[in-house]
Amino acid sequence: MFWDRAALVYDYFERAYNGKVYRATGKAVAEEIAPDDHVLECACGTGAISVCVAPLCAKLIATDFSNGMLKQTAKKVKRFTNVEVVRADITKLDFADSTFDKVIAGNVIHLLDNPQAVVKELVRVCKPNGKVVVPTYINKKNSKSAKMAALLGKAGAGFKRQFDMESYQRFFSEVGYRNVAYRLVEGIMPCAIAVISVDNQSIQTI
């Protein structure tokens, strides 16, 4: 698997190429977390967001499909007693409905064949009045970041689509979510963060 191979060098690449955004995204996501929260993180990667969230919540379950990525996350969070690192498939989560106060899925929906179904799965496991937080790198057409994404795709990253801010917002609207807040972390490869407030309307889209 590409991501198992990439796990050992992923942090080095991110810090060298897009370090400002890489660091700021974790901090921005952490602002959505409350002390009593039970949090599910999908596609945790090497744990860049996990280490920002863990000290702020009651419980964090960090998941990924790549064993290589999970090993890197486990190293980063080993000092925390409230974190569990688990292999999981984001397309079919083995958790009951309305389990978590917050659900996070960072930089993954552009890799998926059916991201619409996955967003609904994230909402399914989130409690009413909870939040689903979805950070995703975005690119302007013909920008340096778009060209870099294309190169990574050729290397095996498996990008299925690229978003700009407008198409990112449109994606959530077309899935059926209206109560969504957005913020943008600026940098070489910017990161758009969508925060879905899980209300009755959100649940009805599942």
Give the residues covered by each predicted segment.
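Conserved class I S-adenosyl-L-methionine
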Residues: 1-34, 48, 72, 76, ...
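Glycine-centered, small-residue-biased loops immediately flanking beta-strands
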Residues: 37, 130
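A short acidic, Gly/Pro-enriched loop at the edge of an enzyme's catalytic core
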Residues: 91-103
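A short glycine-rich, Lys/Arg-flanked "PGG" loop and its adjoining helix->strand segment in the class I
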Residues: 116-128
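C-terminal lobe and adjacent flexible extensions of AdoMet/dcAdoMet transferase-like proteins
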Residues: 194-206
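C-terminal alpha-helical "lid/dimerization" subdomain adjacent to the S-adenosyl-L-methionine
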Residues: 13-16, 133-193
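Class I SAM-dependent methyltransferase SAM/SAH-binding core
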Residues: 40-92
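A short SAM/SAH-binding and catalytic strip from SAM-dependent methyltransferases
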Residues: 102-114
